[in-house]
Swiss-Prot record:
This is ATP-dependent DNA helicase Q1. Residues 481-592 are annotated as: Winged-helix domain. The gene is RECQL. Zn(2+) binds at residues 453, 471, 475, 478. It comes from Homo sapiens. Belongs to the helicase family. RecQ subfamily. GO terms for biological process: DNA repair; DNA replication; double-strand break repair via homologous recombination; replication fork processing. Changing residue 564 to A: Nearly complete loss of DNA fork unwinding, retains ATPase activity (in a 49-616 residue fragment). High expression in heart, lung, skeletal muscle and kidney, low expression in brain. The lineage of its organism: Eukaryota, Metazoa, Chordata, Craniata, Vertebrata. Residues 595-608, 630-639 have a biased composition (Polar residues).
Amino acid sequence: MASVSALTEELDSITSELHAVEIQIQELTERQQELIQKKKVLTKKIKQCLEDSDAGASNEYDSSPAAWNKEDFPWSGKVKDILQNVFKLEKFRPLQLETINVTMAGKEVFLVMPTGGGKSLCYQLPALCSDGFTLVICPLISLMEDQLMVLKQLGISATMLNASSSKEHVKWVHAEMVNKNSELKLIYVTPEKIAKSKMFMSRLEKAYEARRFTRIAVDEVHCCSQWGHDFRPDYKALGILKRQFPNASLIGLTATATNHVLTDAQKILCIEKCFTFTASFNRPNLYYEVRQKPSNTEDFIEDIVKLINGRYKGQSGIIYCFSQKDSEQVTVSLQNLGIHAGAYHANLEPEDKTTVHRKWSANEIQVVVATVAFGMGIDKPDVRFVIHHSMSKSMENYYQESGRAGRDDMKADCILYYGFGDIFRISSMVVMENVGQQKLYEMVSYCQNISKCRRVLMAQHFDEVWNSEACNKMCDNCCKDSAFERKNITEYCRDLIKILKQAEELNEKLTPLKLIDSWMGKGAAKLRVAGVVAPTLPREDLEKIIAHFLIQQYLKEDYSFTAYATISYLKIGPKANLLNNEAHAITMQVTKSTQNSFRAESSQTCHSEQGDKKMEEKNSGNFQKKAANMLQQSGSKNTGAKKRKIDDA
């Protein structure tokens, strides 16, 4: 008869296996829900196509873009005249004319269009073709300031109201809202103005009764939905506008929204029937690239300066940073090396923001080093590069920010520097957001991918089907001619879990930095585990492996909140129990190599001309001299600083 200990051991094994099966069932259930959702989307699209092709369909309610791509409406002559003589444009971009015709017909419409596609024109031009004024709701004051600057240059009467508006200005705007002879065409407000100002709502009612309030434009309409990447609670109050002013047509605009987000936004805005026009996410002139972020700040700045002085010599660009502090520090570093750069962030004085924007627009400043506060509504067509000093907090944000390059349809580069530490800096910021961590991990997955077309990865996120061949080698992954293989990294995961278990027993919390140090046999001796052999891989490879385990849920983040900061720690994740099954394997794609090593493919570009390299080499000497002088000057201040690798530039 079997002993109790043997039976107990078998029972424990079965229990562990059952737990693993439960996790697998959960994963399959999640996948099932994804497929069901995609099936619904495709079914809806097929139904829409069939309805659009129905010969008996009424043109008044025909939601196909083709039905509205005409110039025989009563307002068409005026629209064309204003396009050419006020906005100084010869023709419309895709879906602009269709959207303008729908809103001119007094109907509700949502427009999903890539950043740089010309969404703003779709409510600005109709405002000039209509009596009265259009109310524009924007999420950021900086966005309103950007738009007003452009409108002023075009000679269009527009203004904004916010918390810092003077009493005299508020009084003037309120008077203009009901003045039948007023030339004021666009009034910009934040959603807080609608939610919290009874005085303003009262004035809107009087303007509506006087038939002066004709249209509502909700910019960044994805902010309505809690499932959107930038949910704002005050956007939920905007439903009052259609309830109180049903005859004022509404137009909602966004660069990034899934079908789920748009449906949610439609309910929140109290819209019964709504046209939805969606342009393809693809910007064929943009080249996407992910680079490993150098761990040394000086090396990092050197890499950026070589790009600016080489490939982008004399060309305009944006560098996006994670924080205001990063923005200012990078700006100073670039200026010290001869780059004409200006910082831009939310805490700048309005006049300073305007100065930076104006100088950049006039090419007096080559590079704006900015936080996310810069960009919405930016309409500089000749931006040749957008560099991300740190990755964005979501795919939607990255798509929107990188999309500010190449609005003139000429080739432009979108280069993202991916660093392990940025994961946890951003995670600590988005932890309180509804789906903040999930969206961040999608961004990490994009950065970690070394083989799949960048456009395919984006298309999957935005519910589109994309053939990688259509990329035309306009991303780093499509340019690679390396072979790839799946590397078994299961034992690495087992070792990390041993380290984390020991830390738990000692009542210790491990930050990502401490976990790597312990794994490498460094740091506090008590955190090292007997039997865990330090891997021989470079630190950046170990970081990629840990990031892989994190997004695959073998590890998870835990947070500690202090009065001054949110600290991220790593703990054992929900899928770690799968490792109780000896047959369970975790693999990771790596570049195939003849050497017995784990190496992720380094970033490379293939669309740049040989002249780029020559230009970089030509400017490299000047850069090295400047860098050497800087080091010489700072040497006495920081004798322990690491010597910059100038010879490797």
